[in-house]
């Protein structure tokens, strides 16, 4: 995931000292590369200084160069993506060739097959359960993004029929269960790797989420938010959708972050969980059971 920030160094301080990511490099364009401690790849987050906050792109690593070639062809031929192009190897640090495209919701996505591994701060033989000297909330990995866009049907078709994602959960209209309001998609065993909400706009970014181990770590994250005087959005609380335990807060540029624990293991044959719009408050905030307009209405 690549994010735009308004002032680079305060953003880096937030993502390293508050969230607890590790800086792994900087390139000639001034971009900063970060990873969570238990990720082996060189980076999972890229920060770039810009005039407007938001998401540049979300990237997906596939299992081989052949898969990358096959999927890029399918995306180009699907009619569900525009602006398809190849980014040469080395344009990002420690990263191979990338295939870039824009979804019907206006979000830029990338596929890649090669990224150098730097390890997870632990040995591969007889390791300890976690490394010393972690900072901040100390998430173990980047988890997912929630994105806003207008053509929900098109992006869901692209992700399911072309890219092979599963729908894990969905929100539908109370009086028309064929009309989807939101869809949660997984290409793994997680409750979601990306989610989309139908909104009358293109390319909007709601939040990026990072995984913690348990509810106690979510509460500790709340303490860190208060100690560091970070802008709190809401939480700690629980989602009905995904069952996740959560707290939301903002980076200095206004990009929303989440740290998240719990959830469930998703298998490809698991039936889709459906929520109806009349119960949306409980679906999003299981304890309060009320919609929060600031949570839904603030995005970058």
Where are these regions (language model features)?
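An N-terminus-focused feature that recognizes amino-terminal "leader" regions
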Residues: 1-100
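Structured core of small recognition/catalytic domains
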Residues: 153-246, 251-253, 257, 268-269
